[in-house]
Structures are given as C-alpha cells and as structure tokens.
Amino acid sequence: MAAELDAPGKSTRGRRAPRLRAWHLIPLLVFPAILIARSGPLPGRRDELLWLTDTRTRPLEPRLSVPAADVHRPYVRPREERPSIAVPLRELARLEESGDRAGIAASYLLHGDPQQGLAHLAHAPPSLNRDNDQAVAAFLLKRNDEALTWLDGLLETAPRHPQALWNRALVLREMGLHLLAASVFDEVAALGEPGWSAEAREQASWLRASVSQRAESWNGTRTALTQLAQDANLPIPLEEARRHPGISRGLFYDVVRTAPTSARVQALLPLAELLDRIHGGTALADHTRNIATRDFTRRAPLAAEYARLLRERQPASPDYLTRLRGAGEHDLLLGARLLTPEAQSPPEELERVARQWNDPWIHLLVQDELARQEGLAGEAWQADQRLKAALTLCREKRLRPRCADLLRKVSHRATSANRLSEAEDTGRASWREAQAMGEWELESAALRALAQAARFQFRVASARAYLSEYLARAPDTCDVKNYVHRNIAALELMRLRPKEARRALSRAQECNPSVGLIGAWTLTDLMRLDPRPEDAEQISAELTRAHATRETPGRRMLAQLVQARFELLKDRKQGNARLAAVIRQAAPYLNTDADARDTVAVAYQTMAVTAGEAGAFSEVPGVVADHLGVASPKQCALIAAAEAERTVVVALGPRGQVLGHHDASRKEPLGDDLSGLVPEKLLTLLRSCPRVEVLAAPPLDSRSGLLPPEMAWSYRVAMDASPEPKKKPPPPLHVVVANVETPSGLGLARLSSWESTPAPIGQSMELSGAQATPSRVLEAMSRATDIEFHAHGVVDRSLSEAPVIALAPEYDGRYALTSEALKQVRLEGSPVVLLGACSAARLPPFLHQTSSLPQAFVGAGARAVFAATVDIPDSAGRFFQGVRERIHAGATPAVALRAERLRWLRDVKGAPWVTRVLLYE
C-alpha cells in the first residue's frame, strides 16, 4: 500500500488487492511444472532459458552475483523500454527444488521483473552477493539512492567485489556523477576480468572525455570574458559567448563597467546584441548604448578603480561608494554594492539603482541579494517568498542561467528550514538545468545543494557521492577540498565512525586550518570520542571566527550551542546553564528558523544524556518533558533520549521509583526497531504498571520496539494548543474514509472499510469514492469523535516530508492529506484515530527533529492515534477492528492495543508486524 509514486502498478477495484509475496509465487506458478521437469530441455538449453545466454548481447547492463548470469557479452542500450520476458517456470522449479532463491531472483531480474526479484531476494540467506543483487533490483527500479546504499555497505566489507564495483559505477553514472563513476570503472578495469575490464576502460574514458569537454569549453568562455574586463585591447569573444551565454551575460556587465572609453563600450555592442538575441529583449544593447554616452573624463577613473576591485577581489571602500553615488554612475554603484555585501547603505538603494535600466537579469540579481539580507536579519519567510517570486519572474523571462542559480538558492533555504524534499527537488532541478546549458560553475553549486539535502536526511551514500563528485571537478582547489572533507567528517560522525571523521577533518585542514562551524561541531564530539590535545584550541578559534561573522539567527544559535557543548565537556553545571540560555535565546525564532529548532532539540538531548552520564537520572524526565512540551510524569513512565553514541533511559515505577541506565558504547546508529534499548532491570520495574507512558526525545520518538509487546504503552505527544474547556464537545460522530477513488496515475487499489459494527453511539459518516477529497475529509474530521482511514499511505516528497494519505483529488488535482494540512485544523471531538494505511507512522529522516502523520493528528487534538511504521498486510483490517471494539467496550487505547497484539501473536501465523503498530496519545 505504501508506495513511491513512480512504482509500476495498475488500478484495481474492490477490496484490498493481495500483496504479492515471494512465497506466493512458487506454489501457484512453479510446482505444476515440477511434474514435467524431468522431461524438460537439455542442461545447456536450461541455462539459456534461465540466464538468457543464447544472444550475442547481454540483457542487463548491471552485473548479477550468480556466476552463470555474469558472463560478459556486449551490452546495447535499448532505444525504448523493453517489456519483460516470460520467465521459464519449469526451470525455476528446478531452482526451487534446490532452494536456490538467489538463482530464482537473478532469473527474474534478467527477464525484466525486478519487483519479483526483490521478493525472492528477501527470502534468500543474507550475504554480500544478495546485497549486490538487491542493489541491481533497486537500480532497475530507478531507486538509485537505495542501490548506492546497498553497494557502499557491501564494498566497505569487500572493496574488490567485481559485481558491486561495476554496479556502483553504473549507479553513479545514472546519477550524473560522471567523474566519480569513471574512477570506479577504473577500479573494475584494474581487476583484469576478460571483457568486463575492457568495457570498464571504455566507459571511464567516455565519461571523462564528456566532462572534460564541457569543463574546458565553459572555462574558456569564462577566461575570455574575465580577461576582457581587464584588458580593453582584447578581441570580443563572440563565439565563446554563443557557446555559453549564461556565464557570458553574467560577466558582460563587468566588461561594460571596466571599459575605459566610450569607443570601447561601443565596440561591445555586437556582444550585447548577440546575448540579447539568445536571452530575448534588448536590455543589454540599450544598456551598452546608454553607457557609451557617459562622460568618460569622470567615469574612466571610477571604472579603473572598479577593475582593480575585481582583479584583487576586494570590497569597495565607503569613500568609493560615496563617489559613485555622487557621480550618478548607477551600474558601477550596483556592481560595487554587490562586491561589498556588508556595506552600510539605505535599504532601498539596490532596488532604486536597479530601476535605472529595464533589465530583468539585474532585477533578479538584486532580489537575490535582498533575500540574502532578509535571511541574515531573521526574516526567513520574507526571504523565501522573495526568492520564489524571483524564480517565477525568471521563468517568465526564460533567463535559464539565473533560474538555475535561483533554484539552488531556494534549495539552500529549504535545507536550512528542514524542508528537505523541497531542497532535494529544487537542487536537482538546478543541477539538470545547469547541465543542459553546460554551466559548469552552476553544476558545481547544485552538487553542494544536493549533498546538503542528502546529509540532513541521513542519506550518507548519496551525500558522500555528491561531495566526491564536487571534489573531483576541482581537486586542487583549497576551498573545495576543505569544504568536502569537513562535510565528510560530519557524515562519518553521523555513522559513529570517530576515527574516520578525524581522518577526514585532518584532510580538510591540509591547505586551510579553519574548518568552520560544522568542523567545530565535529571537533566537540571528537573531544569525547577521539580526543586530541589541540582540539580545545581549535574549537575556541573556530567559535571566535563564527561569532565575528554575520550570520542568520539560527546559525548564531548553532554557534552558541557548540560553545555550550564545549563548556559541558569541562563543567557540567556551567555547560547546562549555557544550554538553558541557548534554549531561551532560540525561542523567538522557533516558528521561522529550522536551525533554531535544531539548536533547541540538540540542547535538550545533550542535557538529558549528560544527566544520565552523571547518574542524575531524576533530572531526565523534566528535561525530556520540557523538550516535548508535556507535563513531566510522576509514575509508570519510560523516558528516553539519545545523542550520537549516548543513550539514557529512565523508568518511573508505580510508586514513583526512579531507575535509570546510561550507555555510551553504541558503535552504529540506532535503527527503526529499538528492541533491547531498555535494560531488563528497568522493564522489571515497569511490568507492574497497568500502562506505561513513553516520553521519547527525537530521534527516538515514533520507533517501534522500545517496550516489549506484553506491555501496554504509548508515546506521549504534545498538543499544539490547549483545548477550550468551556466549549461544549460535539455529539458522537464516527467518520470512515474508505473506497477512495485516488488519482488513476497512482495505480492504487480501492480499500474497503472493515466489516465492523458501527459506533455504539451517535452518527456514522463514510466518505468514499470521488467524495473523499482532502477538504471534505478535513471538514468531517473537525467534528468527529472516532475516525478510521482505509487508504493508502504514499511517499510523495513533493507534497510532504512525512508519508501522506492518498485521497480523491480536488478540482485542482490535490489529493494528499498531509501532516502540514493537519497542523492547520482543530479536531474538536478529541477523536480516536485508526490509520489503516501502510507506514503511516514512518518518519521522515530529519537530522535532529521528527514529524509524522500520527504526531500531527495528536497535535491537532486527537485523543489517541494508532498507526504502523511498516507496510501492513490485508489482514490488518481485522486487527484494527479488534482494537477499536475493545476501546468501545471500555478499555483504554494502550490496553486495547496490547490485548489485541498479544492475541494476534498467539493465534495468527505470520503477524510480527503487529509489534510495529504504535499508539500516540
């Protein structure tokens, strides 16, 4: 049910379509063939049928780990997508007889059915080869991020695994990371495998040549235009400008500004007219003619000084800016102001100067700069709106180079706001646009944006790949090396690899000792995990530089947080005081600045785990409760927090007894299942509680397994606002959303409601078919006291960071119920909500915060929400029906969930998924 939007599938009608599982396939399709297996084809022909070896070209470009399927033959990319070939059922039966799941999966992959291949691989024994073939299936399904993660993990264990190296190169090539792909093909070539090595050398050569040609062409144009701004005697580079009009137009304004005479400006007119023809309009030609009429006895000295600033990359002095204002040389003034972002000037000056000529390119440059200034002033919403308005205008004017740059800026701001799906989408759009135009520098900038969007989503393999490609494009540039390696150090620390993080940070410092705020953050953790004598001095120096730099409020808060965590290493009392001060200082920015929210989250996490480290377990409940915005519990509660390798859990017994446990030995990041995190001694204390309230700080909230299935427990979630005590509650209303007519393009089956008795009191309302639109559902829910969803959970990152519930489309095509939409409504009936949607509780992978549909429902006023963190089978309807009926019979939600969970684990075969159904209250 939960599905990526691009997953193949056809719409069906009626009740829930059965999920295809690997163990469904063989009994229905293969075992009949066993009856005639001994009369089948000869062994050689069997191999041809299974592995498609009877053709001169191979059917798949990636390599499988089954030796019979990994014979080299040339590969010819099909001009159009080929339909899958029928699998040989009789031959698959032979593999089934021998228990060869990997072979069955490989045959399905070769025959063009990666979904079936994945289903069989899920039941194959764990191995490196299985990981490789799972990566192949993901690659064929265009899930490159997933494929790269499988392959990188495999290659850490077996660096010379031939198939994995080959497949990694293919994935990187399809991601557009051609230099990195070429280097991996080099590794394959070095293995000396017949056929494969030669093809790998050809691939590497072709990839490098294509990148080198683009880089040389773009750099040639940039050099020609840059030199033109410094030497008025050079010829006008019309051919170079025609090849790369984006960088040419960007530099053309400086060429005009530095021209020493009217005649030289007039000589630039052919270049202006060429660029106008390409971009549309007459702005550059008009501007050139206008500047040619200026009095160059006054302008020439000012132009010469501007040329010096460009050459030396220096900001303009206040005196120079004053002289430009007095002379009325508006184009020079604008250029000097853009060279001097910290200049003190009237806030409206840039827009006033830009209005001196009718040039949308200049207007967009000014809007970009004004958005930057608004961001620094803490006006994040205004900055976002200004950039998006500029992007809209840019598209209208078809100024593609400016649009690519604005997309990258929007991506950066979205990353800063933890709108990570938007950040990735706009970053990738910038990358594609820049590649299409051959704008080398914009491509590199987009790679940085993509790397940051991936890093903040814990997508380590992709983030590392983007960073490595960025470095490969400028391997000898100090700033690039420093940037890449300090970010890789942060990635390694996210994986709890302190030695590797230290090594990356050392590489970052090879040409520049400063590693910025991110490096200071990393060093603060390394002082605990892998200390060096020089760390304290380095952190102090970085913080001094950070405090002296003009930054956004959120970045300033992050610097204060690093300072507080640094102090905490030396003195817990003083460090806690600083952390508390940081939390207070960040409060005004929490609604608008994600860096401020991250600061507060990490500050609370740090206070909690260090309290546990000090044995002050009685402090932990208050810290985590403050973080979550709920009252601190007194009894029958579990409180949990984690930060990096450290975890603290505290149990409050039925009489308020406090028992805690602190652990700092973890070597791997926590997974989605937290089973075993709470020691048995704490569980023993909690077993006598009728129900346990769990307060878990991000990133532990909304994960399964924190407590065992025999306990009645739920996650405590804060409401966004206090209920209105004087308002009369609405009458009982049972709302059911089922049989939804989702957009046909999603390929989702209709899901019927469960066969359950109606709500015992009050009215029932079912929203189904085309009537179950987001707006109608939200309106009905606002008065409901009991809500059931029988709908698909869908991952659509263009709509929400969390999974969404797929509903019927509105008139404008909107079909998704999102957590963001829930935050805008109030559920007046304090309903119990059953989310019969796959993975409705699955979390978006934020670095320090979490957000999910169930949390949004509770925040909007729901009394209790049931949801699963995994894909659930068709039988889930009966499970949720049982839970609801127990609640209507008088059980509390937590007790009802436990009772039904234990019944299913006892009586229903293959129901471990019930332990992944969580309750939020």
PLM regions: where:
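Register position in tetratricopeptide repeats
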Residues: L110, L140-L141, E174-M175, W206-S210, ...
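Alpha-helical linker/edge segments of TPR/alpha-solenoid repeat scaffolds
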Residues: A204-T223, T258-A263, G281, A292-A307, ...
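Canonical tetratricopeptide repeat
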Residues: G103, D133, N167, R201-Q203, ...
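Single-residue signature of alpha-solenoid repeat helices
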Residues: G117, A147, A181, A383, ...
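Catalytic cores of enzymes
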Residues: K634-S665, L677-E921
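Juxtamembrane extracytoplasmic segments of single-/few-pass membrane proteins
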Residues: L25-D113, P270
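Residue-level recognition of tetratricopeptide repeat
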Residues: A106, V136, L170, W206, ...
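Residue register of alpha-helical TPR repeats
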Residues: G99, N129, Q163, E199, ...
